[in-house]
Amino acid sequence: METTNFGFVASLLFVGVPTIFLIGLFISTQDGEKSSFYSDSGKGKLGPKR
């Protein structure tokens, strides 16, 4: 039982962490105009959306 429980937690972390990272990356890309890091590199893509 402990091994299956550990495998479940491990797989949950393995899937959950990259998912949270991708969601955060998507949100930061959507708000790229406000962020100084994305304002220069993403201006061509996010400019017309203004």
From Swiss-Prot:
Bilayer-crossing regions: 7-27
Any one GO BP annotation for this protein: photosynthesis, light reaction
GO CC annotation: photosystem II; plasma membrane-derived thylakoid membrane
Places the protein is found: Cellular thylakoid membrane
Cross-referenced Pfam families: PsbM (PF05151)
SUPFAM superfamilies, sorted: Photosystem II reaction center protein M, PsbM (SSF161033)
Membrane topology listed for this record: Single-pass membrane protein
Protein keywords: Membrane, Photosynthesis, Photosystem II, Reaction center, Thylakoid, Transmembrane, Transmembrane helix
Main location: membrane
InterPro entries assigned to the protein according to its UniProt record, in alphabetical order: PSII_PsbM, PSII_PsbM_sf
Subunit structure: PSII is composed of 1 copy each of membrane proteins PsbA, PsbB, PsbC, PsbD, PsbE, PsbF, PsbH, PsbI, PsbJ, PsbK, PsbL, PsbM, PsbT, PsbX, PsbY, Psb30/Ycf12, peripheral proteins PsbO, CyanoQ (PsbQ), PsbU, PsbV and a large number of cofactors. It forms dimeric complexes.
Described purpose of this protein according to its UniProt entry: One of the components of the core complex of photosystem II (PSII). PSII is a light-driven water:plastoquinone oxidoreductase that uses light energy to abstract electrons from H(2)O, generating O(2) and a proton gradient subsequently used for ATP formation. It consists of a core antenna complex that captures photons, and an electron transfer chain that converts photonic excitation into a charge separation. This subunit is found at the monomer-monomer interface.
Family: Belongs to the PsbM family.
The protein, known as: Photosystem II reaction center protein M
